[in-house]
């Protein structure tokens, strides 16, 4: 992104105010569809292949689109003429797909520059990969053992499109780009109403940017409340309607409050407060009392309802006591458990026992939800009994086996940090038996006869696939392999989670 910023010659004054002219530059389309910017997107770029017309694309399409954008009202058309309006073989729908991808890349540039400048001069921990999803769990293991409560929050998403536009308005100062963005956003909703069976009209990167900008706005306000929690304990959020005057009002309130009540500033301030977000969910861990946790709960409710105009029910915010309740986060059920430890001490001729209690974070596999996902994808029934995968029976034997091995390996790696492996063994058993039943169905045989004919070597991939990775951590020996089933291992190369079938 730094090389792209230098190529575009952005400076501090221009990076937010002159984005709209980039829509008419051919080189920005090359940047938008570069494979490095789309490396995390499983959907192929529409520059490579269009699923609607099965045609290859080149820079000529970009020139045609730019010429059409120069024409007045070239992109405005009725819904009835959606598929009939074509330009040299390409529909207006396809051009809107290109614009949506381009808009996401252009508006990401100032955000990326701001994010990069915020990390300058800061020392980041190098003990583990910060990009990995599993890097969150060592952090939780170190911090949550000192806390009492966790606030489990389901982040709401605005149902009205204008809220998204208004949220973006405070970060992107280019009015022309915002008007163009509003037009594309409303047109995309019209397309969805026109044909609900269509696949995603706009690129997923476009909607991912909208969600990130929405959450970024929410977190910017939340962090202000976090730093000034002692001052805002009785303030109504109705005074925070206008984002432009938000910080002015807050600073004035702080100044008055400090002058009038200098003796009680630190009474309710909580320095031990940690915030973690993943996808549409976040947790707030603290050592507060139940009263203060309820105050934080209604802070969130009032923030979403009064400032973001989103109906947010208090039931979506759960207060979990770590010593008693489990909280679900990132596919794990986590809780704190007390492990008693007895130490025998010898002093001269006297000996005595010392009882110690160690707090440990336990992470369990939610077996019921995973079995539900496997049943939804036809790997088993709702009770967890393996069934044959009928849709894969037409594939080759090696393809079927490789698919099951890949799914089993992905699940094993992600849930390798579980405190107890019993549920993980059950999931592996379901996948292995489902694989055998699928192969037996393809060859029109029974499971017993199929295994008897091919022998036990068929399932060696399931047994050795994980050892090849774990052998890089532990030496190959009987005691080491036995230890692998007891220790918790967090793989620090897991960057994203996809569905079980398509994950590669």
From Swiss-Prot:
Superkingdom field: Eukaryota
Keywords noted in UniProt: Chloroplast, mRNA processing, Plastid, RNA-binding, tRNA processing
Signal sequence residues: none
Localisation per UniProt entry: Plastid, Chloroplast
Keyword Disulfide bond attached: no
Main location: plastid
GO molecular function: RNA binding
GO cellular component, one term: chloroplast
Homology family: Belongs to the intron maturase 2 family. MatK subfamily.
Protein name per Swiss-Prot or TrEMBL: Maturase K
Source taxonomy: Eukaryota, Viridiplantae, Streptophyta, Embryophyta, Tracheophyta
């Amino acid at each position: 992104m730094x090389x792209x910023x230098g190529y575009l010659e952005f400076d501090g004054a221009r990076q937010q105010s002159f984005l709209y002219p980039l829509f008419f530059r051919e080189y920005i389309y090359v940047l938008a569809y570069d494979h490095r910017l789309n490396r995390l997107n499983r959907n192929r770029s529409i520059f490579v292949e269009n699923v609607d017309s099965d045609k290859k694309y080149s820079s000529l399409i970009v020139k045609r689109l730019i010429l059409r954008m120069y024409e007045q009202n070239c992109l405005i058309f009725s819904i009835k003429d959606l598929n009939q309006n074509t330009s040299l073989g390409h529909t207006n729908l396809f051009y809107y797909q290109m614009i949506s991808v381009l808009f996401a890349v252009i508006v990401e540039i100032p955000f990326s520059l701001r994010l990069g400048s915020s990390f300058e001069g800061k020392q980041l921990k190098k003990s583990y990969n910060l990009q990995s999803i599993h890097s969150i769990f060592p952090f939780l293991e170190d911090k949550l053992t000192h806390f009492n409560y966790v606030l489990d929050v389901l982040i709401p998403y605005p149902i009205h499109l204008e809220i998204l536009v208004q949220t973006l308005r405070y970060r992107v100062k280019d009015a022309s780009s915002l008007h163009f963005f509003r037009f594309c956003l409303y047109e995309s909703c019209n397309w969805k109403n026109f044909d609900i069976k269509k696949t995603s009209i706009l690129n997923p990167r476009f909607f991912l940017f909208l969600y990130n900008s929405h959450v970024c706005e929410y977190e910017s306000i939340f962090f202000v409340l976090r730093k000034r929690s002692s001052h805002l304990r009785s303030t109504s959020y109705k005074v925070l309607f206008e984002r432009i005057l938000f910080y002015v009002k807050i600073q004035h309130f702080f100044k008055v409050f400090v002058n009038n009540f200098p003796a009680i500033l630190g009474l309710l301030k909580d320095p031990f407060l940690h915030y973690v977000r993943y996808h549409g969910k976040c947790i707030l861990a603290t050592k507060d009392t139940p009263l203060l946790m309820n105050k934080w709960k209604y802070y969130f409710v009032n923030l979403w309802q009064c400032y973001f105009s989103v109906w947010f029910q208090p039931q979506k915010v759960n207060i979990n006591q770590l010593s008693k309740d489990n909280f679900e986060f990132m596919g794990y059920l986590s809780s704190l458990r007390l492990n008693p430890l007895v130490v025998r001490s010898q002093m001269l001729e006297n000996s005595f026992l010392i009882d110690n209690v160690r707090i440990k974070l336990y992470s369990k596999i939610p077996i019921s939800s995973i079995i539900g996902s496997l049943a939804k994808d036809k790997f088993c029934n709702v009770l967890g009994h393996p069934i044959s995968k009928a849709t894969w029976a037409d594939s080759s034997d090696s393809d079927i086996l490789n698919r099951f091995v890949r799914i089993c390996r992905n699940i094993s790696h992600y849930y390798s940090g579980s405190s107890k492996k019993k549920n993980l063994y059950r999931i592996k058993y379901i996948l292995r038996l489902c694989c055998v039943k699928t192969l037996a169905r393809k060859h029109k045989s029974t499971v017993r006869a199929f295994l008897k004919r091919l022998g036990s070597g068929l399932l060696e991939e399931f047994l050795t696939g994980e050892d090849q990775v774990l052998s890089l951590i532990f030496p190959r020996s009987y005691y080491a392999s036995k230890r692998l089933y007891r220790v918790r291992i967090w793989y620090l190369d897991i960057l994203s989670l996809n569905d079980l079938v398509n994950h590669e």
